[in-house]
C-alpha cells in the first residue's frame, strides 16, 4: 500500500541524507563498508583527463580500468569479459566510456557494441551507464543528420565523400542516441568558440 503523505516525506528525507552526494565519499563508504567503489571502464586510448577526473572526484585513479584496443578502437570482447568478471565478483561499474575521435588517431570506438554490452550486463544485474567522450569527433555527427534531426543512411552520407563513412563509423554514430551522456567540443572540428563545449545527458534531471 502507498505510504501516507507524511511518512513518504520523512522517508524521502532519510533517503536523501544517506546519498553519496550528501554524505561525501569518505562518510558514505565508512557507513557502508560492505560496498565497493565503482569502476570506470575506458579504452587505453582515452584522454589523460579521465585519470585526472577520477582523482578529482575522489574515486581514485585505481578505479579507472583501461581496456585494450583493436585497431585503435576499444576491444568489445575485452569489455564483455571485464563486465562478466565484475558481475561475478560483485564489483559495481559506474560507466563504460566510448571515445568518438581519439586525440592521436581520430578513431571512433564501437559505440553500438558498447551499448549492446551494457544491455547484456544489465540483464544479468550489472547496471551501468555509457558515456561518450565526443570532445574531438562529436561535431562530425552533424554530417549524419538531416535537418529534422533524423539519421541519414550510410549511402546518403557517402555520396558526398570518396571513402567515408566506413560501416562501423556509421553504426557508432547511429548508436549515440542509445547512450546515457555525451561530451562535445564544437570548437575543434566545428571551429566555433571554446564556450560552445557541452555535457549532455539523457536524463535531464541531472
What kind of region is each of these model predictions?
Residues 1-204:
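Conserved PLP-enzyme active-site core in the AAT-like
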Amino acid at each position: 500500500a502507498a505510504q501516507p503523505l507524511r511518512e513518504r516525506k520523512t522517508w524521502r528525507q532519510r533517503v536523501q541524507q544517506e546519498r553519496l552526494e550528501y554524505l561525501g565519499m569518505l562518510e558514505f563508504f565508512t557507513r557502508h563498508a560492505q560496498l565497493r567503489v565503482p569502476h570506470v571502464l575506458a579504452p587505453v586510448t582515452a584522454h589523460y583527463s579521465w585519470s585526472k577526473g577520477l582523482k578529482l572526484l575522489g574515486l581514485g585513479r585505481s578505479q579507472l580500468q583501461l581496456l585494450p584496443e583493436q585497431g585503435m578502437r576499444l576491444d568489445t570482447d575485452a569489455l564483455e569479459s571485464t563486465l562478466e568478471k565484475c558481475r561475478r565478483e560483485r564489483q559495481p561499474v559506474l560507466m563504460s566510456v566510448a571515445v568518438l575521435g581519439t586525440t592521436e588517431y581520430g578513431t571512433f570506438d564501437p559505440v553500438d557494441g558498447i551499448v549492446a554490452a551494457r544491455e547484456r550486463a544489465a540483464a544479468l544485474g550489472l547496471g551501468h551507464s555509457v558515456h561518450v567522450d565526443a570532445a574531438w569527433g562529436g561535431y562530425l555527427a552533424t554530417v549524419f543528420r538531416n535537418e529534422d534531426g533524423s539519421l541519414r543512411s550510410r549511402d546518403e552520407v557517402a555520396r558526398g565523400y570518396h571513402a567515408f563513412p566506413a560501416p562501423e563509423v556509421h553504426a557508432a554514430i547511429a548508436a549515440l542516441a542509445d547512450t546515457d551522456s555525451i561530451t562535445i567540443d564544437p570548437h575543434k572540428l566545428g571551429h566555433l568558440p571554446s564556450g560552445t563545449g557541452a555535457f549532455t545527458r539523457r536524463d535531464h534531471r541531472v
